[in-house]
Structure formats: structure tokens, C-alpha cells
UniProtKB/Swiss-Prot annotation:
It is linked to Granulomatous disease, chronic, autosomal recessive, 1: A form of chronic granulomatous disease, a primary immunodeficiency characterized by severe recurrent bacterial and fungal infections, along with manifestations of chronic granulomatous inflammation. It results from an impaired ability of phagocytes to mount a burst of reactive oxygen species in response to pathogens. Changing residue 359 to E: Abolishes autoinhibition and promotes phospholipid binding. InterPro entries: NADPH_Oxidase/PX-Domain (IPR051228), NCF1_C (IPR015039), NCF1_PBR/AIR (IPR032136), NCF1_SH3_1 (IPR035756), NCF1_SH3_2 (IPR035757), P47PHOX (IPR001655), PX_dom (IPR001683), PX_dom_sf (IPR036871). Residues 4-125 form the PX domain. It is found in: Cytoplasm, Cytosol; Membrane. This is Neutrophil cytosol factor 1. Detected in peripheral blood monocytes and neutrophils (at protein level). The PX domain mediates interaction with phosphatidylinositol 3,4-bisphosphate and other anionic phospholipids. In the autoinhibited, unphosphorylated state an intramolecular interaction with the C-terminal SH3 domain precludes phospholipid binding and interaction with CYBA. Phosphorylation disrupts the autoinhibited state. SUPFAM superfamilies: PX domain, SH3-domain. Changing residue 303 to E: Abolishes autoinhibition and promotes phospholipid binding. The modification Phosphoserine is found at residues 303-304, 320, 328, 345, 348. GO terms for cellular component: cytoplasm; cytoplasmic side of plasma membrane; cytosol; dendrite; membrane; NADPH oxidase complex; neuronal cell body; phagolysosome.
Length: 390
């Protein structure tokens, strides 16, 4: 078994807690060497104490001997009173700090002090109980990772979803569900695996097992884009259902509809169908890195879930495979017509000249003059020839 180390640390946001007194904790998603992902909570005072100890352990890299040799990032000291504004404004600094830590030499980025600090503690597993008078308020980071004072104006109410069927977890990072369980969604990944919490549990759940409480439809699903986005398959997949597409690793496709359940509609030549999004990578990006980040299989599709039970009277609104195919074919035909030169479009300068000549009006043919007019206006020689002919 290899050495333990951290691959990546992402700041998810922060929580405003009221027990035992009001304070703020930051939420970090820590990805370990075995591709497991854990959420940990740390106060900024804890982070700053960790930072001070790290500088003492590596004085040269901290610039204590020569400031020019410093590679350990700076971290401002906490203030006497840190309010919500300070907690918000500090998120950008912490994001850069964690990113820099992971890029340091392994003797620092994999040292026991750093690994121990980001390991899951018993307190990280304690969630607020139902009998608490005031539950924590969750503030999530924007998608682009940049936080300003205007990005977060109030507590973000986590979206609530309901399980439509039982789900048995297949790894330690997942969470088991029973039909009717209500969960809060912390993160919606494009892979179709959502990070959720429920009472004293947290973990990844296939989005296909969840439905919104107020409607069967997912309001955040984008509209189809029949122009398509170029993607490359980073892992081979063989279709299981009739409306899916089989691809080999390295095949290029166009994505025409990105659905949140992790099954995107793709176009390969004139064929359309579903394909797991976690096996796709945008064209032109590093494929090897994306392949290393595949940590679990594709999530199951809702059509494959047995004994699914929805609380809604009507079913979800989904385009059929025929509708995708018709709309895609219609778009491709229109694009080909626009790209093909029209009958009035000249193909070369010579053709343009011929077209111009053909478009000019032809001169009118004058009427034949009468015999009297010819005799009156012709020369004497012509008159003698006409007279001899008669």
C-alpha cells in the first residue's frame, strides 16, 4: 500500500454556527490518494495555528532565515472579532492558500502535520440535531471559486430532495438511502453524483435516485444545444439500453444536452443517444489527468431503478430519443444548407463574368426595311443590280 497523501483541497464555503456560541467554520472537501473525498470543518483560528506551526517546522521555506527563500504562503492573522463579513472576504485567501500548499515540495505538502490537520475528526461527523433551536446557516462558495462581498448576501438554503428508491452504497464515500428519505444537496457534480447530507450522515448519492419535493422536474437542467460542444471519450463504454451510445476511448463526439443526472445526450455523426458524462472530456484538454480523476463508475439511470416511487402525480418532462434525433437532423440539414454555395453564388471570377453577361438584357432585333425604302436609300450600284435582277 502506498503512502498516504492529499491530492487536492477545495474550499466549499463556511457555516455560521450558534452552539455553544456564535462562530464560523470553513468547509473543506479533501481528496486523498485513494480518491476518497471527505468534508472537514475548521475554524480560522485553528487554520492560523496550523500555519504558525508549519512555519516553525520549515523555517527556511518560511523565509525566517532569508525572506527571498520563502515558498510557504502568507496567511493574515485573525482579528479580535471576526464577523460574517470577515468570514466571507477571507474565502479567496484560503482558496489560494490551500492551492499553494498542495503545490509545495512533498516534504511539506505530505508532512504528518498537514495530513493530521485535514483528517476527519469526530466533530466533523456531528451534524445538528433536530431539537436544536437554531440550526447552522450554510454559505457556499460561487462556482468559479472567487468570493467577494456581493457574492454571498445571505445564508444559502440547501436544496432539499427526496429519495425515490432504496440505494445501497458501494464505497465508504457514498451514502445509503431508503425510499422517502429527505436529504440536503451540498454539491451537484456534472458526473451525476451529488454530495448530500442527512441528519448524521454525509456522502455521494446518484442524482437519479433523487427528486425535488415540489416538482418531478429538475429546474436547473439546461436547454439542449443542437450546435453541440466537442468532447472526447476518455473511457470506453458499451451501451446497455437502446437509447444509449457505445464509444471507444478517444472517439470524438458532440454534446447536445447536459443533464444533471450525469447522462448527457451526445451526437456521433448522425446518431444521438445517452452517454455517461464522467467518461467525457472537453476537446483540447488534458485527457490523462481526467482519466486519473475517475473515482467511481457511472451513476445508474432512472429508467433502470426498480420499485421507484415518486410523490408527484405527473412524470418528468424528458425529450424522447426520437425528438433528439429529429431536432438534431433538422439542425444539421440547416447547417449544411447554409454552408453549401447557392445557385446564384458564383464559384469563380470566370463564372461571375458569365453570370453577369447572362443577366444583361439582349438588344432588340430591328424590323426588315421595305423594298421602296431600300431603293430610295441604297447606292447607284445596288440600284443597277436590283434592276437587272428584275
Amino acid at each position: 500500500m502506498g503512502d498516504t497523501f492529499i491530492r487536492h483541497i477545495a474550499l466549499l464555503g463556511f457555516e455560521k454556527r450558534f452552539v455553544p456560541s456564535q462562530h464560523y467554520v470553513y468547509m473543506f472537501l479533501v481528496k486523498w490518494q485513494d480518491l476518497s473525498e471527505k468534508v472537514v470543518y475548521r475554524r480560522f483560528t485553528e487554520i492560523y495555528e496550523f500555519h504558525k506551526t508549519l512555519k516553525e517546522m520549515f523555517p527556511i521555506e518560511a523565509g525566517a532565515i532569508n525572506p527571498e527563500n520563502r515558498i510557504i504562503p502568507h496567511l493574515p492573522a485573525p482579528k479580535w472579532f471576526d464577523g460574517q463579513r470577515a468570514a466571507e472576504n477571507r474565502q479567496g485567501t484560503l482558496t489560494e492558500y490551500c492551492s499553494t500548499l498542495m503545490s509545495l515540495p512533498t516534504k511539506i505538502s505530505r508532512c504528518p502535520h498537514l495530513l493530521d490537520f485535514f483528517k476527519v475528526r469526530p466533530d466533523d461527523l456531528k451534524l445538528p440535531t433536530d431539537n436544536q433551536t437554531k440550526k447552522p446557516e450554510t454559505y457556499l462558495m460561487p462556482k468559479d471559486g472567487k468570493s467577494t462581498a456581493t457574492d454571498i448576501t445571505g445564508p444559502i438554503i440547501l436544496q432539499t430532495y427526496r429519495a425515490i428508491a432504496n440505494y445501497e452504497k458501494t464505497s465508504g464515500s457514498e451514502m445509503a438511502l431508503s425510499t422517502g428519505d429527505v436529504v440536503e444537496v451540498v454539491e451537484k457534480s456534472e458526473s451525476g453524483w451529488w454530495f448530500c447530507q442527512m441528519k448524521a450522515k454525509r456522502g455521494w448519492i446518484p442524482a437519479s435516485f433523487l427528486e425535488p419535493l415540489d416538482s418531478p422536474d429538475e429546474t436547473e437542467d439546461p436547454e439542449p444545444n443542437y450546435a453541440g460542444e466537442p468532447y472526447v471519450a476518455i473511457k470506453a463504454y458499451t451501451a446497455v439500453e437502446g437509447d444509449e451510445v457505445s464509444l471507444l476511448e478517444g472517439e470524438a463526439v458532440e454534446v447536445i444536452h447536459k443533464l444533471l443526472d450525469g447522462w448527457w445526450v451526445i451526437r456521433k455523426d448522425d446518431v444521438t443517444g445517452y452517454f455517461p458524462s464522467m467518461y467525457l472530456q472537453k476537446s483540447g484538454q488534458d485527457v490523462s489527468q481526467a482519466q486519473r480523476q475517475i473515482k467511481r463508475g457511472a451513476p445508474p439511470r432512472r429508467s433502470s431503478i426498480r420499485n421507484a416511487h415518486s410523490i408527484h402525480q405527473r412524470s418528468r418532462k424528458r425529450l424522447s430519443q426520437d425528438a433528439y434525433r429529429r431536432n438534431s437532423v433538422r439542425f444539421l440539414q440547416q447547417r449544411r444548407r447554409q454552408a453549401r454555395p447557392g445557385p446564384q453564388s458564383p464559384g469563380s471570377p470566370l463564372e461571375e463574368e458569365r453570370q453577369t453577361q447572362r443577366s444583361k438584357p439582349q438588344p432588340a432585333v430591328p424590323p426588315r426595311p421595305s423594298a421602296d425604302l431600300i431603293l430610295n436609300r441604297c447606292s447607284e450600284s445596288t440600284k443597277r443590280k436590283l434592276a437587272s435582277a428584275v
